[in-house]
Amino acid sequence: QFIVDLVKNKHINADTDYSIAEAAFNKGETAMTINGPWAWSNIDKSKINYGVTLLPTFHGQPSKPFVGVLTAGINAASPNKELATEFLENYLITDQGLAEVNKDKPLGAVALKSFQEQLAKDPRIAATMDNATNGEIMPNIPQMAAFWYATRSAVLNAITGRQTVEAALNDAATRITK
């Protein structure tokens, strides 16, 4: 209902999607957006003066964003499991290794406490960690595609009036649990 009301009261457009919202923010046409570290390089290129903060509460409760986690795995069939383990433990998952990854794509908040302490000097990272602490780990499973598709359909159906919010969410729950 919250999103339906935002559209109804003309705070957001009914046809806004990620790419439209990101482009509008990067052009300075939108006052705020909810995004993550993956978007920072584009914002920086746009020369937008921005900050990152704790997501607002909703009905007095902290927001619970999905939290993505960068992982590394070793194929069970690998003939070099020991070498791969050594690389991960002694090179990649170190302050220096994560710093190299972070130079390529911002990691946001990280689980390695020593590197997180270095990153937390950046207020964007500190806020990202605060949000992650309140959040829920997003499973990296194929069923998440069904979740996102059903959720998108529910939002579109509710904001266009094709369904009530309750009916749209019930349909989404049915699709997700099939």
Predicted segments with their positions:
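Extracytoplasmic ligand-binding clamshell segments of periplasmic binding protein
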Residues: Q1-I43, E82, A168
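Short, solvent-exposed loop/beta-turn-alpha elements that line the ligand-binding surface or hinge
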Residues: Q1, T57-P65, S114-A120
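Solvent-exposed, amphipathic alpha-helical segments
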Residues: F2, A150-G161
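Short, well-structured alpha-helical segments that form the helix of a local strand-helix-strand
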Residues: F25, V165-I176
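Extracytoplasmic/periplasmic substrate-recognition and gating elements
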Residues: D5-I12, D44-K105, T160-Q163
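Long, aromatic- and glycine/proline-rich binding clefts that accommodate carbohydrate-like moieties
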Residues: T53, V101-A150, N157
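Soluble non-cytosolic domains of exported or imported proteins
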Residues: S19, S78-E82, I141-Y149, Q163-E166
